[in-house]
């Protein structure tokens, strides 16, 4: 069956980024839930799905309680490391800031998004649907019961539109 000549895409067309299976080197850790990786000769910003850490880098916003600790934890765990990225079938490919939305797995198989939550460095970000939502919410409940990280009583936390925010 012949479908006709191949179409040539105009030069301004961009190819959507699909994460090829494999590991990618983390080139920068911006904060607790955002990293950059080297992917196919370019740098891609990656926002971790389903987790929210206190802000340290948001323009015109104060540094939030627990933010520096979450950033430091992510830097210690991920700076220069190789990670495996996984998309979520029910979430978008990119967010409004053009960051890839991904689950980030460490070389040993640890799901870093969930680790941030279970260690109290972040909280489940449930504003948007994602496959591991129940798992992440349970990890957050366990961290809260154990008074870990942001749940240790130092930060005054409130929930706003599916996000837990610090008032301290």
Predicted stretch roles:
Residues 1-168:
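Small beta-barrel nucleic-acid-binding modules, primarily SNase/OB-fold domains
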């Amino acid at each position: 069956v012949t479908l006709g000549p191949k179409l040539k895409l105009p030069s301004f067309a961009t190819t959507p980024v699909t994460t090829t299976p494999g590991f990618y080197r983390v080139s920068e850790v911006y904060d607790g839930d955002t990293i950059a990786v080297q992917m196919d000769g370019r740098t891609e910003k990656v926002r971790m799905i389903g987790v929210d850490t206190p802000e340290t880098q948001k323009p015109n916003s104060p540094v939030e309680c627990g933010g520096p600790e979450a950033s430091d934890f992510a830097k210690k765990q991920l700076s220069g490391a190789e990670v495996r990225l996984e998309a979520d079938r029910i979430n978008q490919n990119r967010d409004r800031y053009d960051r890839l939305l991904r689950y980030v797995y460490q070389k040993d198989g640890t799901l870093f998004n969930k680790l941030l939550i279970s260690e109290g460095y972040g909280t489940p970000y449930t504003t948007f649907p994602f496959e591991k939502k129940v798992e992440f919410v349970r990890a957050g409940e366990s961290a809260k019961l154990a008074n870990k990280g942001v749940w240790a009583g130092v930060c005054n936390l409130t929930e706003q539109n599916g996000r837990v925010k610090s008032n301290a």
